[in-house]
Structure formats: C-alpha cells, structure tokens
C-alpha cells in the first residue's frame, strides 16, 4: 500500500486536560514490521524526525471530529489527536483506519476496546443484543434510566452502545422535554434523576452527543439539568448567570451569525466544564477529554473566522486608536483583543504566525502605546497581557518597531519607555504588573534571541538604541533615590553610617530591586554598552548606597550587582572599583551586620571567597592593604586570612624576582609587575579600539570627565617627538655596574616596541621596587631626560622621581601602538 502524506499537527492530552502541541509533520499509513501491523507515522516537516508511530489496533476506538480531526486513546491515560490541514487528508487516513478495523468509513466512531474478561463475559451471555435497550422516555422511568446510564460508565463497550442508542433515537431531546415538565411540576426527585442522567451522558465522552447537547436548542436545558445536584440543598442558578449576569458584548457588530453562535456556544461549554461539573476524580479524568477537545477546536475555529474577516479587525483597530472613542468603548476593545490573543494560543504555529503578523500589519503596537498610557488600570493590565503575547511571539518584531519609532518620536513616548514608566509607576503594593513588565523588558534586551544577518546585526543596533534612548528612564528611580547621599571618604571603618535618603519604603525598595535585577542581567549579557554606562554614571557607587537599606533583600540585590561585575574578572572594572574605594560600603555592611549568621553575611563572605579562590591579585592587594585591620578579627571563616596569605605569597614572589635582577633595574618605575601593567594597558586600549570600531553607544550625559585616555594620548605624542629629537643627539652608552654590563637601547625602534633584547627584558623581568634603592642611586648611568611635566620619562628612573612616575605609569613598549 503506497504511503499517503498529509500535513498534520500532533497533539497529546496532558494531566490538566489541556492539549499539548507535539509538532507539525506529514502523516502516512504503512506496514511496520516491528509492530507487525499497519501503523500511523508522522514525520516532522522540519527535520524528518519521527513525531508519532502508532499501530492501528483493531480494537482501538478512533473518532473523527469536525472533518479535520482524528482522536483516540493509546492507553488508559494517553490521548492523541491528529489535526489535519485539509479535509481530504483526514478522510484518506480515516479510510485507512476503517479499512484495518473492517469498519464503514462513513461512521465517525470506530469500536471501543474490550478487555478479555469483558469479552468472555459477553460470550457467556448470548442473549445480549448488539444495542442497549433504553427504557421509554417518561417520568416514571427516570430512576431506571439514571441507573442504566450510571452503570455503563465502567464498561467501554457499553458506553459506546449507549451512545449509539442515544444518538440514533433522538433520546436527549426527549429527556430535555421531561426536564421542562419536571420543573413545571416542581418534581424534585425527577430533577435529581435528570442531573445524574445528563452528567452521565457527558461522561460518555462522545463528540456526536455534544453536538446535540450544546446546540442552541438544547444547551440551556442541559445547564438547567445540571443545576439540580442531589448533594446540594438548593439548586444553583447557572442559567440566570448565563442569561442575565454574563453579557455578550459585541465591540463591533458581528455580521456572521455562525461566528456569533460559535462564540456563545464556546463560552457556555467552557462554563459547564469549569464551573458546573465537579472536579473529576482520578477515575473520571479521561471521561471529559472529548469535552476539552470540543472547546479547544471551537476556539481555533473562532480565531480563524475572525482573522479572515479583515473588515471587522480593521474597524476594531480604527476605533481603538481614534481619539474620539470614549474610555468605556476603548476598554471593551482592549478586552476583546486580550481574549482574541488568548484564543490564538490554540492555533498551530504556522497559523499563529499569520495571526500575529496580521495584527502587526494592522497596527497593534502603536495602538498598545496609546492604551498603555491611559489612566484606567483595567485597560493597562489588559494591554500588558497583549504586549506579553507579542513579545513572546516575536521579540524581534517589537524591537524593529521601537527602533523605527525612535526616528520619528521623542524618547518620552517610545513604546519601551512607556513600558518602563508603567513598571516604575505600578500602584500595586506587590508590584505584580511591574514584575510582569520587567520580565518582558528582559526578553527584549536579551542578546540570546537577537538575530544576526550578513547585512545588519540586530544586537548592536538595538543595544545602541536602548542605551541611548531608554536606559536613563530605567535607572532614573535608582539615581533619584541615591542622589543626595554623600559617601564619606574619610569615615572610620566599622562606624555605623545611616543614609537619610536610602529607600526604606517597601514598595520603593521592591521597585529598586527589580531595576537592579535588570541591570545585573545587563552586566552578564551586555559587554561594552553597560560598561560605558557604569563608568559614565559611576553607577556601582550609587548602587552600593543601597547596602544601607533596612530591607535586606535590597541590600542583597546591590551586592549581587557588584558580585556579577567582579565575577567577570575584568581588570577594567577592577581598577574602577579600586579607584573608587567601592569595597568600603560592602565591608561596612559586613561589620554592621555583626555576629548575625544570615544571608547577607554569607553573600558578602562568598564575594571575598571568590576573589581569594580566583586569585584576583589587584583586588586582593587592595583589600588587604586597606581593610585587613578591620577584617582580621573575623575568624569563623578563613576567607580573610586566606586573602592575606595570597597577598603575602605574591609579595614573596615579587621579592624573589627582585633579588634575581641587577640592582640597576630596581626602581620605583616598576612598582608592580610590568607584565600586569602591559596586560592592563592592552585591555584598556583594545577595548577603546573595539568601541570605536563597533560604533558603540556614545557617552550618555557624562556626569564626570571621561578617563584620561585622550589627554594621555596627546602627552604621549609630545613625549614621542621629544624623545626622537633627543635620540638623535644622545646616542646610547654602555654602563658598567660591578662586573655586569648592560646596554640600554634608547632609540626610536625601542620606543616603537621593537623586539630588542634589552627592551623586552626590562618589561618582562623588572619586579616592583623595594625600599632598597641605594644601588640605583649609586649607578653611573647618564641619561639626559626632559624634566617638565608630561615630557619623556626614561626607561630607568630614580626613586626621588616618584611624583613624575605617578603622572606616567604606562609601559613605554605599549604606547607607540596608539600613534600608528
């Protein structure tokens, strides 16, 4: 038999009775040797992988629903569905199934499975007819009918037979006529029996019966029967709610009567499932799988019908963005779109893509920009939900819109800034809306879901846009709440310092925690953009002011921000921290925390432990030299003693290097390892080159002058010229110190980083200067050097030239690269 491929979507029913999408592929029916029978195979259209392999069991009950669905159960708790793109494909596969089972393809349901014990039981009862005999539909037989319906639920074959009888004889409509009679007669006993009957029929789980029960003619009577639960003292008033309380609002008149009927039906059936029917027990869960499917595919049909009606959607958008539309009407329109987007989640991926593209083309994002700025909380909440659907569907689509918008609008009205402002101004004490919006912002600025093509890079374009136009809005509350606090540089370490402006308001603290979470995300996932911003705004210093907050969670957020920065092990950041003495507020917090063994204590110690374990030398030296006296009393962990040990080991290594180098090279010039100096400069200059080459974000509103790179660069050019002139006049001389001879290659080639032996040895082997500088003082080296500030500094300096050395601590071997 030849394979027939049809495009399908595979669904499975999960524990919550919701259909899970397992993928799109092409179905075929073929003989599988391993399964020893005809089977249904679905291969994914993306990569050809096997999505489904299911043997067509002769005893499995297959159901065909709504012309394009085939549903069946593989095991007791495993339901499957194939949703076909075309009716013809569904019909063809249905014929294959019926052919294997020996059934007429005109039926919509094949036989249910019969377990062996039940089959034997029926063989022992030859008098059992093919169909169940139903009692006549009259008041006196209601108890008998109820007993019959209840008794068949445990038997798959009897459920199927009862369903066939009910469908063929129009029995349900007769039962509903009896319901009306019982209500008119106030026949409570009869109404209780009808409740059991209708509930049992629902548990038969048959789509054909649902079509009858949920028709316009019958559904309200079905709801009426379900009001009379015998377990309740008084009947519920579900019909009153559905007809009077629940109002169907047509934001724009729906001209398609079939669509209107489908919407009414879906709402009422959902109400039956969610409100009226009791929560099913473990044994009853599978009884309502078809009801779940009925609702699911109804929603798919509603979305498809609305999407195809272009006039309807165009009119909705026109009214939504019209300034003349009153607030009540706009609220209804936004709520409609929220429901519409929620229903769209039932669509297959390719249809969902088309749906959101339709909304985008009609202008959903500019419309959201308007409604998110409204005062109505309900409207803003609905707009946020719609925005979340769009961001989840396509972050790139939203990013593209806001970047185009930035060319025509002020920063204040940009969509992302409107979203940030909504997050900042959330009036909910628990900041529920702000948390949701923060998650959406994080998705939008996440480089992991940004596209990179040959012609353009979304990441660099969008991050440039975000840091230029949006970051100042995001950080405004943080900067405002830390603006008046002045850090006391000369404060005695360990003293209690209380900030008068540090936010102690719980809601403000929560908001700042959210902002810090986003900024921490930026540190982890953005490179030079966030680095530029932190430096220009001195952001870490401002963040660490929050270590004074009485809310420990906010202090921890501030600490986490610093921990992520240190975790990058970037010397650029390390120099910034050292220069700003930014460990001071952290150590204040540790000491003020006292002997309390809490999360703050552990987090601070972990920060220092990380520095110790990773052996970050610059930070280790800074901490030990400046704070060890305050920390040495902490003995319940060995972290700080370990830092001191690391520091001393490094000093010993430098001393050993110093002892192996001739005294002529011992100079204040090399206060630290020259290689470390070169590495730092290489990092600094490379980053600057990278930033220029990648058209990085220009500095945003500088609050302090840029680092000294441009000025230093000018000094370097002046120095280089002076040095070249001097080299022409003063040739290098050979100098003798004891029995050791050393030639200084004081030439243009050396200044330009030529690989001469001597210039390399100075850079590679000169250790930090020690207190013993006498030997260099006695050296008879004669070199003429210009002594004015900013002029040339010799390769070897004398200890009394310290002031000049502070001005110029750059390795001469590295600098010439800048002038090239």
Curated annotation (Swiss-Prot):
Gene3D superfamilies: Leucine-rich Repeat Variant (1.25.10.10), Pleckstrin-homology domain (PH domain)/Phosphotyrosine-binding domain (PTB) (2.30.29.30). Residues 701-711 have a biased composition (Basic and acidic residues). One of its GO terms (biological process) is regulation of double-strand break repair. Residues 682-711, 750-820 are annotated as: Disordered. Residues 682-694, 798-809 have a biased composition (Acidic residues). It comes from the Eukaryota. It holds the Pfam family PP4R3. Residues 1-100 form the WH1 domain. SUPFAM superfamilies: ARM repeat, PH domain-like. GO terms for cellular component: nucleoplasm; protein phosphatase 4 complex. Residues 750-761, 768-790 have a biased composition (Polar residues). GO terms for molecular function: protein phosphatase activator activity. Serine/threonine-protein phosphatase 4 (PP4) occurs in different assemblies of the catalytic and one or more regulatory subunits. Belongs to the SMEK family. This is Serine/threonine-protein phosphatase 4 regulatory subunit 3-B. It comes from Xenopus laevis. The gene is ppp4r3b-b.
């Amino acid at each position: 038999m030849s394979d027939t491929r049809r495009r399908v979507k595979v669904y499975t029913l999960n524990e919550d009775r919701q259909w899970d999408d397992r993928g799109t592929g092409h179905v075929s029916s073929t003989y599988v040797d391993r399964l020893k029978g005809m089977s249904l195979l679905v291969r994914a259209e993306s990569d050809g992988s096997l999505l489904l392999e299911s043997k067509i069991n002769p005893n499995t009950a297959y159901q065909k629903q709504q012309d394009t669905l085939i549903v069946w159960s593989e095991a007791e708790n495993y339901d499957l569905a194939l949703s076909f793109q075309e009716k013809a494909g569904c019909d063809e596969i249905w014929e294959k199934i019926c052919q294997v089972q020996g059934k007429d393809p005109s039926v919509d349901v094949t036989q249910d499975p019969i377990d062996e014990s039940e089959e034997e039981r029926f063989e022992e009862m030859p008098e059992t007819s093919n169909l169940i005999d139903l009692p006549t539909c009259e008041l006196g037989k209601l108890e008998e009918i109820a007993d019959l319906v209840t008794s068949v639920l445990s038997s798959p074959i009897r459920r199927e037979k009862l369903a066939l009888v009910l469908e063929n004889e129009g029995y349900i409509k007769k039962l509903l006529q009896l319901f009306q009679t019982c209500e008119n007669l106030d026949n409570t006993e009869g109404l209780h029996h009808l409740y059991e009957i209708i509930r049992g029929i629902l548990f038969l789980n048959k789509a054909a019966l649902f079509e009858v029960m949920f028709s316009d003619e019958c559904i309200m009577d079905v709801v009426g029967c379900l009001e009379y639960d015998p377990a309740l003292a008084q009947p519920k008033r579900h019909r009153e709610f559905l007809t009077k309380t629940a109002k169907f609002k047509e934001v724009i008149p729906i001209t398609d009567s079939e669509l209107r009927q489908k919407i009414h039906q879906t709402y009422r059936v959902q109400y039956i499932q969610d409100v009226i029917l009791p929560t099913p027990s473990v044994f009853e869960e599978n009884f309502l799988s078809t009801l779940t499917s009925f609702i699911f595919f109804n929603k798919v049909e509603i979305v498809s019908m609305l999407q195809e009606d272009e006039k309807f959607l165009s009119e909705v958008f026109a009214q939504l963005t019209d300034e003349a539309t009153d607030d009540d009407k706009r609220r209804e329109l936004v709520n409609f779109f929220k429901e519409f987007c929620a229903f769209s989640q039932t669509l297959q991926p390719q249809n969902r893509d088309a749906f959101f593209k339709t909304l985008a083309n009609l202008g959903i994002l500019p419309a959201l920009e308007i409604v998110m700025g409204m005062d109505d909380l309900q409207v803003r909440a609905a707009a946020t939900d719609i925005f979340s659907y769009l961001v989840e569907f396509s972050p790139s689509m939203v990013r593209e819109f806001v970047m185009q918008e930035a060319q025509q609008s002020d920063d204040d009205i940009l969509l992302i800034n409107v979203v940030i402002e909504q997050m900042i101004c959330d009036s909910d004490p628990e900041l529920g809306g702000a948390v949701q919006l923060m998650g959406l912002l994080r998705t939008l600025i996440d480089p992991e879901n940004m596209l990179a093509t040959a012609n353009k890079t979304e990441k660099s374009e969008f991050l440039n846009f975000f840091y230029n136009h949006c970051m100042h809005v995001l950080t405004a509350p943080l900067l405002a709440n830390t603006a008046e606090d002045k850090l006391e540089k000369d404060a005695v370490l360990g003293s209690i310092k209380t900030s008068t402006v540090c936010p102690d308001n719980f809601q403000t603290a929560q908001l700042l925690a959210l902002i810090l979470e986003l900024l921490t995300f930026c540190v982890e996932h953005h490179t030079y953009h966030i680095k530029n911003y932190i430096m220009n705004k001195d952001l870490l210093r401002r963040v660490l002011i929050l270590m004074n907050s009485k809310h420990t969670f906010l202090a921890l957020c501030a600490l986490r921000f610093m921990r992520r920065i240190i975790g990058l092990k970037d010397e650029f950041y390390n120099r910034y921290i050292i220069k700003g003495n930014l460990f001071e507020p952290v150590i204040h917090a540790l000491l003020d925390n006292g002997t309390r063994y809490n999360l703050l204590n552990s987090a601070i110690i972990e920060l220092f432990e990380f520095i110790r374990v990773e052996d970050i030398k610059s930070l280790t030296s800074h901490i030990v030299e400046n704070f060890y006296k305050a920390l040495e009393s902490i003995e319940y962990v060995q972290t700080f003693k370990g830092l001191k040990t690391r520091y001393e080991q490094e000093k010993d290594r430098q001393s050993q290097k110093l002892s192996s180098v001739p005294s002529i090279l011992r100079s204040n010039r090399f206060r630290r390892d020259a290689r470390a100096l070169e590495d730092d400069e290489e990092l600094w200059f490379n980053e600057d080159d990278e930033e220029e080459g990648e058209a990085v974000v220009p500095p945003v509103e500088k609050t302090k002058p840029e680092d000294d790179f441009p000025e230093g660069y000018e000094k370097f050019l002046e120095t280089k010229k002076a040095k070249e002139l001097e080299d022409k006049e003063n040739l290098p001389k050979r100098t003798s110190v004891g029995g050791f001879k050393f030639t200084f290659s004081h030439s243009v080639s050396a200044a330009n980083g030529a690989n001469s032996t001597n210039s390399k040895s100075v850079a590679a082997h000169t250790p930090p200067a020690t207190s013993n500088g006498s030997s260099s003082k006695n050296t008879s080296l004669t070199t003429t050097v210009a002594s004015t500030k900013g002029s040339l500094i010799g390769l070897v300096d004398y200890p009394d030239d310290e002031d000049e050395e502070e001005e110029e601590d750059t390795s001469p071997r590295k600098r010439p690269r800048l002038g090239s």
